[in-house]
């Protein structure tokens, strides 16, 4: 699991954690033979991500937004932890992610998308890629939360939806937590587009130092 930092001037990996499945952590002899410390316990990928984010934030790494794919966005504990630190995020979730919309009743992300009128969609670029601008149709709708204090109400919860322009009309879904003053559609689209930075980093690391062949050890 890798943590990638993306800024205006570029991006770089700044931390990593080795994911070990339970078939490994539950087999002490296997771990001993591989040189894995006895104290190593099983941790999910979102839990490893939290450890890295906590290290980065606690050491003062400037962080405007956190973004990641469905593996991390689908973990509510990670999302709630980020909220507890008032750390804005745009995290991908699955189409069947249950969300509070228009009240304290769960609605699937794809059902929310189906309910939005045509005027809710706007064509925007999620940054330029190798083949030009990454154009998609995007919709943004607020999610419901019980917010009592003025401090809680400073932040909003939203569902950002991306729809492809081809015949497949494929959708992607993002749960957003952000200050209401910063939650413009274009800003959130830009953050969602930053997730490609980690894929760019992987390709560069594979070509330059054989990351896919573990030549960096």
Write out the residue ranges for each language-model feature.
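A general structural motif
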Residues: 9-11, 61-63, 86
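Short, conserved catalytic/metal-binding motifs centered on acidic residues
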Residues: 1-3, 66-72, 89, 174, ...
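Short, solvent-exposed helix-loop connector elements
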Residues: 77, 111, 183-192, 207-217
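A short acidic (Asp/Glu
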Residues: 74-80, 99-104
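Short, surface-exposed basic-aromatic patches at helix termini and helix-loop junctions that form
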Residues: 58, 79-88
């Amino acid at each position: 699991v890798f943590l990638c930092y993306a800024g205006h001037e570029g991006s770089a990996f700044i931390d990593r954690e080795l994911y070990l499945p339970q078939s490994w952590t539950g087999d002490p002899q296997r771990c001993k033979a591989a040189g894995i410390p006895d104290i190593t316990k099983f941790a999910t990928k979102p839990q490893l991500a939290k450890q890295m984010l906590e290290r980065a934030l606690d050491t003062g790494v400037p962080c405007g937004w956190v973004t990641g794919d469905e593996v991390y966005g689908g973990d509510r504990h990670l999302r709630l932890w980020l909220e507890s630190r008032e750390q804005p995020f745009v995290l991908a979730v699955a189409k069947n992610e249950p969300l509070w919309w228009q009240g304290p009743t769960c609605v699937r992300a794809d059902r929310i998308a189906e309910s939005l009128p045509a005027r809710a969609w706007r064509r925007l670029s999620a940054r330029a890629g190798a083949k030009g601008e990454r154009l998609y149709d995007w919709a943004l709708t607020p999610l419901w939360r019980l917010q009592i204090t003025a401090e809680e109400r400073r932040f909003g919860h939203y569902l950002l939806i991306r729809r492809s322009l081809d015949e497949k009309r494929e959708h992607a879904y993002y749960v957003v937590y952000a200050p209401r003053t910063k939650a413009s559609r274009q800003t959130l689209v830009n953050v969602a587009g930053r997730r490609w930075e980690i894929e760019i980093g992987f390709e560069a690391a594979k070509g330059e130092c054989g990351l896919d062949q573990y030549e960096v050890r």
